[in-house]
Amino acid sequence: AVEGAYQNGDMVDVVSNKGRYLGTGWMNDHSKIRVRIISRNANDTFDEAFFRRRVRYALDYRRTVMGETDYRCCRLIFGEADQFPGLTVDRFENILVTQVLSLGMERRKDWVYRALVELLREDGEQVDAIYERNDVTIRTLEGLEQGKGFYQMEGLKTDLSGHVTITENRIKYDVDYMEGQKTGFFLDQKYNRQAAAKLARGRRVLDCFTHTGAFALN
């Protein structure tokens, strides 16, 4: 049951049947996921500074775990795993490709995008553009419009070709982030490709149903 008035996308507290606080998330009664939890701290204030701290943590974690080379080609934000429900951010060198799949995240994406650009640049990283790949049907289920295109922000480009060359596991790829599946390349499979390469070494292997050929190239 819901107590009090709300609009879809608003932050709401979730409590147990005994009134115990369980977490806070954004509400959307159009979605099959009624509430997406973003925090389990009742003292959090969900302003721009809150999301900036979350972005800072995600960036620092990647840099520590992946090192400088892989950091230029990786998934910077991985949805709920980074406590950003419904948000994917992939970095392809100087291009950030995003996908927003929840109404609550859509309403707060400007804060997150601004934090990404500013914090990456503070770290000495170049960011030329943000390209949104919101051309997915799940957005319709969230009550959101589908679409794709360059995100408009001062200092970002909006006239790039849609292709970028990346290096992953010492292999170069031409990524089509405008027309390729999802964000253009499955960066979340980076370590699976490394594992497959070890298993396949010295063997003849058939790569079926390939998208970019990344598993075979490894």
Q: Residue locations for each model-derived region?
A:
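Conserved hydrophobic/aromatic pocket- or pore-lining residues that grip, position, or stack substrates
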Residues: 94, 173, 192, 209
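Non-catalytic substrate-recognition/targeting regions of SAM-dependent transferases
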Residues: 79-90, 110-185, 194
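Short, surface-exposed beta-strand-loop junctions and turns on beta-sheet-rich folds
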Residues: 31, 104-106, 181-182
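A short interface-forming secondary-structure element
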Residues: 93-106
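Conserved SAM/SAH cofactor-binding pocket of Class I
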Residues: 195-218
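Non-catalytic accessory regions of SAM-dependent methyltransferases
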Residues: 1-93
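S-adenosylmethionine
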Residues: 1-24, 102, 154, 164-171, ...
